[in-house]
UniProtKB/Swiss-Prot annotation:
Family named by the database record: Belongs to the TBCB family.
Chaperone found in the keyword field: yes
Designated name of the protein: Tubulin-specific chaperone B
Quaternary structure and interacting proteins, as annotated: Supercomplex made of cofactors A to E. Cofactors A and D function by capturing and stabilizing tubulin in a quasi-native conformation. Cofactor E binds to the cofactor D-tubulin complex; interaction with cofactor C then causes the release of tubulin polypeptides that are committed to the native state.
Amino acid sequence: MTEVYDLEITTNATDFPMEKKYPAGMSLNDLKKKLELVVGTTVDSMRIQLFDGDDQLKGELTDGAKSLKDLGVRDGYRIHAVDVTGGNEDFKDESMVEKYEMSDDTYGKRTDSVRAWKKKMQEEQGSAAPMENESDKLNEEAAKNIMVGNRCEVTVGAQMARRGEVAYVGATKFKEGVWVGVKYDEPVGKNDGSVAGVRYFDCDPKYGGFVRPVDVKVGDFPELSIDEI
């Protein structure tokens, strides 16, 4: 039987950790490829740090050809992926005033920004996924094609695609607009179907999440096998 590790994945691209399963024999380079959409950068611009079960830094993983097991990764460890270009920090550090005051036209011309990376990925993949600043009208139109019980795949920004089942579609009390509640196949969500004391659907903790309709694709999206995760 293939040895599989349960790992916590964190990144400087998001404040929310994810729990993923990876084969012990997977190479570091293959892991980086899996994390490209999560970190928002390419394999060559990614650093990987390893933390043990007590969250103590073990070191940086650099040999891309070696397996996770050979590099000292073990079940329950944490993998922290870092974009060395610092591009995705534009969205996290509120003290970086220059980033927020930069004109949209100037930012759009940058080739090292997260926006440029996402545009490149969309062109390569032929994706029609809307960008982050789509109007409420687009969300309302997208919601018309989403029904409770649909299998779906969720892609928010540069994060890794997540699969699950649509559990709620409609307005919420926590924020205006149309939202889709998703019951994920894995514990990659933020809640149990409730937000601020209001329950919208039922699921286990960390298996639920709410996203905008434009970030949801419905269709034949079965649960991923270990090799596909």
